[in-house]
Curated annotation (Swiss-Prot):
InterPro entries: NA-bd_OB-fold (IPR012340), Ribosomal_uS12 (IPR006032), Ribosomal_uS12_bac (IPR005679). NCBIfam families: rpsL_bact. HAMAP family: Ribosomal_uS12_B. One of its GO terms (cellular component) is small ribosomal subunit. Belongs to the universal ribosomal protein uS12 family. This is Small ribosomal subunit protein uS12. The modification 3-methylthioaspartic acid is found at D89. Part of the 30S ribosomal subunit. Contacts proteins S8 and S17. May interact with IF1 in the 30S initiation complex. SUPFAM superfamilies: Nucleic acid-binding proteins.
Length: 129
């Protein structure tokens, strides 16, 4: 516990919080161009081929972003929108690609959680209403 005199001399130091997604630079999303689209394997207890893309953002920073959902149409030079959000079992992947925006198509035949995957409402449901 500092004395009053010590506080007068030095003051309190402000704790600096570290951001989880520094490449976004305090923006909610950023646009970028895919430089490489590939699959990678997750950490120890899990086993899969996770789809990821290396993206050069509009601020010239290059990041690795996860492609959510089943199937995608991304290739090199595709323009994508990325948001923050890490993938727990992929080290170094701290961003997600937003489905259904720019060059990224939405997930086809998606019935639930459609807004998260850029899927339109199915025609059969729309006709009933």
């Amino acid at each position: 516990m500092p004395t009053i005199q010590q506080l007068i001399r030095h003051g309190r130091s402000v704790k600096v919080s570290k951001t989880a997604s520094p490449a976004l630079e305090k923006c909610p999303q950023k646009r970028g161009v895919c430089t490489r689209v590939y699959t990678t394997t997750p950490k120890k207890p899990n086993s899969a081929l996770r789809k990821v893309a290396r993206v050069r953002l509009s601020n010239k920073i290059e990041v690795t972003a996860y492609i959510p959902g089943e199937g995608h149409n991304l290739q090199e030079h595709s323009i994508v929108l990325i948001r923050g959000g890490r993938v727990k079992d992929l080290p170094g992947v701290r961003y997600h690609i937003v489905r259904g925006t720019l060059d990224t198509s939405g997930v086809s035949d998606r019935k639930q959680s459609r807004s998260k995957y850029g899927a339109k409402q199915p025609k059969a449901v729309a006709a009933k209403k």
